[in-house]
Amino acid sequence: MTTYSCASWTIALGGDGALSLSRGGQSLKTRLVAIKNGVSPRNTQQQMFDLRLTERAGDSAELLDVRPEAERLTVRTALGEGFELEYILAPNGPLLEMTAVLRYDGEEPQRLRFLEWTVEGAEEKDYPRMELFGPGTMPCVDEPIDLHRRLDRWQSDNIISHIATSAAPYNSSGVMGCYDAERRAVQATWFLSDFFACATDGLYRRGRLTRVSRITCPRMMRRGDEETIGRFVFLLDGCARDAAVRQVAESFKTAGWDKENDEKALRAINLLEVFVGEKSNRTLIDTFDELADKMEELRDMGFNAVEIMPAFPWPSYSVVDFQNVPATYRDTDGLRRLIERAHECGLKVVFDMVFHGPRDFIDPRLNAIRSPLLDAHPDWFARTEHGTFAKTYTRSFDLSNPDYQRYIADSMIYYLDEWRADGFRLDAQDWNFFPNWDETTGRMPYEMLLAGYRMMENIRARVLKEHPHAFFYTEARAPGAGNGHEYRYNYDYHWLYPSLCRVVDPRGMAPMVHNYGSENTMSWADAALWCAENAAIQPRGVVTMQQVDSHDSAEWSGYVGGQFNREAFGGACYEVLFTLAALLGGGMMALYTSYEGHEAYVSAVLKLRLNAPVFRYGDCRHTALSADDRKTACLFWTHEGDAAMFVGNLADEGKTVTVRLERGAYPADVSVRLRDMISGDALGDFAAGALEEGVMLHLEPFEKHIFDLERI
């Protein structure tokens, strides 16, 4: 085995072409294998993953050349069958960044599908010291959730198989590894790209902790072709867990996703999402005129923005023509009255834009019309490798098509000019997560994969030239969401609710976020840690729109009528979860009527978000306040000299708990009166230092309080 030193890293080259990476007494072993040819048997959203009869190149690679340089090491290997892979490794302190350059010199064209990326880390003998490390990665598994459980105590051999098709870094962070809690050492890996996505098949407890991921890079490879794919990032460091999170955050910053936006101004939004008509056999409201009559009431509840979705049941999420408002919203007179009334009441109006495509059939029961885009612009749609149009339940737009992107920008400007829109909620930006194999486009097939996010930089810039007040809200929910958006969804948080609380609906809950093995097993301390780490790696200037219910989550269950979370968890628990979401430090969204029966409490919380300076302008400290109970949620907020804290019982049982404030989180030499900011009742007077020692509270089932620390 040949060994090279590169800054603080040692890189060894094995006879099979794998790379061994070492630093500070820790090591990782990694390799890339090219997956090619085969067939995608189904024309569905799973085209990128449901592949059959594929071939592999690189399981046993041959070393061709090594070029050591001062700041990097270049390793060239032959994968076989005409493929050559060059690794470019550049150390940056505890981080090692790797770029891969794939070349082809064979005779016959090859259809590249993806690179299989394997990383072997901690050895089995070290599992008793190791816990999972993955800020922003959702540990939503079918067994009890404990972020500090040692690796030898997990039952699942594949710890994270549930996120196999998440498109990191857009729909999960993709950070995976382990932390040695005894020796304070971390090893982790992730992948950064605006073109290629990392989809992880598993994190396996084999002889070593082994990550197996797919770097999706579909294209045809012909003689003389090459493709540069990166960046692969490796972290080996001896440090505390929070310091390791900061290393990850600094790495994500280099991707250029940060924005110079005023986050505190952006998060002062309470958005109401609403659809008119029937969806999932449930009708929230029948007409736009009825909704217009509700605007004053909704404003008085504390909402300051309304998101208007296409008409249901048709066209629903089938695109007809963005600029054909009668076809998309049906009742244009009612829509105009709604917008006018919303603005009169001081509410911003957000239009929902759906990007995946139109249905290519007509259902006479829905009085449906065929989208003119299907015939007028066939080049706007993706093709499968078989030459047919790609589709899920709609024919799939190719979001990398420049003409289609111009149409999107034109449509946004039209809504801003003619319909007085204030912003846009962007749906299904990665729903069409597969390549466009149409070789007449002049674009690479992989350019379609993440184009829905990448395109927003240019679209946003064009729209803001004419309408600088406009804002954009993406369904993505991870660091890559910083591309062209002020707001992002919180779908990376929804798994927390059933992990923290018991599901009481006898029907159960949506399996997308719910596992019976993990239901009600997570402690608030772990949840707070996960929230803090997830928030730390998000791009600056992008605000997470927190929510308990959305139109999507309401239908995930597949039940007739859908399922609101007040139905899943019960009304009392719902109020605790709503408060948590509202005070996690982002914007807030609610689905119309999802809060039915709880309007007064929801209104009180929404108004606090907008009117209390500590929440409007302050900072959320997820882990600064804690309780000696697994099921007591705590949050701490500060702003200048003000402070507030939330304490909520997540369980259907009364309890007495001791709540403690982290030392240094608030001046210990002042006295405060804890006053409930909703009821106005005072709990008592305390020296702030006493909060560090602990204050006892008795909480009835699902009792919750938002306390102001009123200086006396």
Could you describe each region identified by the protein language model?
Residues 2-76:
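Acidic-aromatic substrate-binding/catalytic surfaces of carbohydrate-active enzymes
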Residues 30, 35, 39-40, 44, ...:
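Polysaccharide-binding surfaces and accessory modules of carbohydrate-active proteins
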Residues 96, 121, 141, 150, ...:
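N-terminal structural segment of carbohydrate-active enzymes
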Residues 162-174, 178-182, 624-666, 708:
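Carbohydrate-binding surface patches
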Residues 258-259, 265-289, 296, 301-304, ...:
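Substrate-binding/active-site clefts of carbohydrate-active enzymes
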Residues 270-272, 306-308, 349-351, 424, ...:
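Hydrophobic faces of well-ordered beta-strands that scaffold small-molecule active sites
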Residues 460-461, 467-597, 610, 620, ...:
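Conserved alpha/beta catalytic core and glycan-binding cleft of carbohydrate-active enzymes
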Residues 688-712:
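C-terminal beta-strand-rich structural cap/linker in extracellular carbohydrate-active enzymes
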